[in-house]
Amino acid sequence: RLSVITFGLAQIGMDIEPLIGMLGDADVLHGPTHTILGALFIAALVALVAPYICRPILRRLNQEAQACRLGWLSEPEPSSMVVWASALFGTLSHIVLDAFMHADMHPFAPFSAANPLLGMVPHDEVYYWCFILGLIGALTWLISKWLIGRKLKA
């Protein structure tokens, strides 16, 4: 299982530093938060606040699904384990994807300034695969929810 809301919050948390850097015209946009240690710290913060953000959003989405007679799309509140896994997956995958594209990334800092992933996958291809895999994930989720909903009716 994965909490898409928590995963999304983790992505937002990771990009706060680059946003501040862009607004301040900084030379380095991907600093301490774009390291493995920084990602672990942000994941912990996200995992701690996510339940308070997820509950009202899920409650509203589930109400709307019921009102539209799409109750089979309803989602339960994620467990603590799912929240933590989603936050970690969100921040660590962010590090990997950004490391392919950004020369100012040092994912292993403070232990190493190396970025062995830089340039391994072309910039546009990273976005292409994110789109394709996101689409596959969304379709898989939708089909599995539909099949489970049909099974419950039978």
Regions found by a protein language model. Give the residues of each.
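N-terminal membrane-targeting hydrophobic helices
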Residues: 1-154
